[in-house]
Amino acid sequence: QRIQHIRDYCEEIRKTIERYGEGFAVFDQDADYQRSIAFSILQIGELSGGLSEEYRKATSSRVQWGPMKGMRNLVAHSYGSMNREIIWETAVNDIPTLKQFCEEQLAES
């Protein structure tokens, strides 16, 4: 169930990028865009923290769970000063890979 929710937030990020437009310049200038992406990343980090230690260890070669939780903390505790470049890079580079992983896991179950 958590993997399904993580996948859903990955899809939300994809849809948000599709809606607002690709490119950091667009993202950097739109606070709503930033908040939407950041919220989904925060939720993904929160959900990943609830996965069993056994599962995280078993899948650690495919997903870096620790940094994901770290991103959650970065977003949650940035108090308006989050690093937009890191958020953007996560959204466009890491989230598609995570989504693919989740889809594979869901197909196997």
Q: Regions from the language model: what does each represent?
A:
Residues Q1-S109:
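Solvent-exposed interaction patches of small proteins and small membrane subunits
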